[in-house]
Amino acid sequence: MGQKIHPIGFRLGITQKHRSCWFANPKQYPTLLQEDHLIRQYIEKNLSNAGIAQIYIQRKADRIELELRTARPGVVVGRGGRGIEVLRKGLKDLLGEQKQIRINVIEVKQIDAEAALIGEFITQQLERRVAFRRIVRKAITRAQRRGIEGIKIQISGRLNGAEIARSEWSREGRVPLQTLRAEIDYSYKRAQTIYGVLGVKVWIFKGEVIPGNPTEISE
């Protein structure tokens, strides 16, 4: 059932780290989980042109630490750090609590090897009414130049304005979804076209993570 489950959630703690990292008592857990969701929604909406690949959230007492992996850090930081201050103020207004918010911006070096950024590129091209096969071919070519071992792209919906919705996919190389040690990057994006919504899924196989020998515990 490896193809049925979310590829990232399937590998948490093995080849993927948790996107949110904190502990809470059962009464606080739903509130904090909803806060995380609101934070991600706010950042993705207000920094849609910054090429956000991943958002990591950590909580320590009354402090929230955000790590933004982005293709365009200059857009996030802004001139003289003004963009960070605007983002921090917006998040404080959203949460409505006096919490310290620390934002760390990390630049993504290999843009064409990130599933989220490839998905974003495809949705932008689809919304400009470019033929989907040409977009997929271009995205795969760009990704292969970065030395990945495999990529799969699937687009679903009313492709090229067809009356009946369908799914089309293309794959190059290996994408072993059932291998737990395989480092799989996955993203799902939606393109809003004049014919309706198109769903875009991207899987990238970056190689296998071979675990080292376990350290022996001295008695």
UniProtKB/Swiss-Prot annotation:
Chain's gene name: rps3
- Which proteins does it associate with, and in what oligomeric form? Part of the 30S ribosomal subunit.
Classification via SUPFAM superfamilies: Prokaryotic type KH domain (KH-domain type II), Ribosomal protein S3 C-terminal domain
Disulfide linkage: none
Task: Give the species.
Answer: Cyanophora paradoxa
Q: Does the keyword Amino-acid biosynthesis apply?
A: no
Q: Which BP terms does GO give this entry?
A: translation
Kindly list the places in or outside the cell where this protein is found, as annotated in its UniProt entry.
Plastid, Cyanelle
Lineage summary: Eukaryota, Glaucocystophyceae, Cyanophoraceae, Cyanophora
Write the protein's name: Small ribosomal subunit protein uS3c
User: Which PANTHER family does the entry link to?
Assistant: 30S/40S RIBOSOMAL PROTEIN S3, SMALL RIBOSOMAL SUBUNIT PROTEIN US3C
Domain KH type-2 as annotated: residue spans: 39-109
GO terms (molecular function) for this protein are:
rRNA binding; structural constituent of ribosome
* Entry similarity comment: Belongs to the universal ribosomal protein uS3 family.
